[in-house]
């Protein structure tokens, strides 16, 4: 099987709960290698650009407001079948539908404040990684 990369965000509500280390531990326990990570505080322009596909939808302004309300942690994760495995670990977007033991079941507060984001395809992962990480900021793990 081919090694893939996926993109992950720990959103402001989960950062505020001080569970970054717990989430990273769950990534690693699930077999992911963290090959890039950083904390940042999105500007309105960055949030609008990242979520541009949702512009015009009723929840867009609230999503931008939430995503700029505090720091986030963006990461690049690597493993076999990374995109699907990461999405399985996150759980359903709506935490009311998230299975017990998933990150959203454990750390989400609402549909918008669902604690985490994960790429939905290999193509989205590549685009999202490039949005936040410059060349050389992702370090392949060889050991």
UniProtKB/Swiss-Prot annotation:
This is Nucleoside diphosphate kinase. The active site is at residue 117. The keyword Kinase applies. It holds the Pfam family NDK. PROSITE patterns: NDPK (PS00469), NDPK_LIKE (PS51374). It comes from the Bacteria. One of its GO terms (biological process) is GTP biosynthetic process. Gene3D superfamilies: Nucleoside diphosphate kinase-like domain. ATP binds at residues 11, 59, 87, 93, 104, 114. It comes from Enterobacter sp. (strain 638). One of its GO terms (cellular component) is cytoplasm. Its cofactor is Mg(2+). Its main location: cytoplasm.
């Amino acid at each position: 099987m081919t090694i893939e990369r996926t993109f992950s965000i720990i959103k402001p509500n989960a950062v505020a709960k001080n569970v970054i280390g717990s989430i990273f531990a769950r990534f690693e326990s699930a077999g992911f290698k963290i090959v890039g990570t950083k904390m940042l505080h999105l500007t309105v322009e960055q949030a609008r650009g990242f979520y541009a596909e949702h512009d015009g939808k009723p929840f867009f302004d609230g999503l931008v407001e939430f995503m700029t309300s505090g720091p986030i942690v963006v990461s690049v994760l690597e493993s076999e079948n990374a995109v699907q495995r990461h999405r399985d670990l996150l759980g359903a977007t709506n935490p009311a539908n998230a299975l017990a033991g998933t990150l959203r079941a454990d750390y989400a507060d609402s549909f918008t404040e669902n604690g985490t984001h994960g790429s939905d395809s290999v193509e989205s992962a590549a685009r999202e990684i490039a949005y936040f990480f410059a060349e050389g900021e992702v370090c392949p793990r060889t050991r």
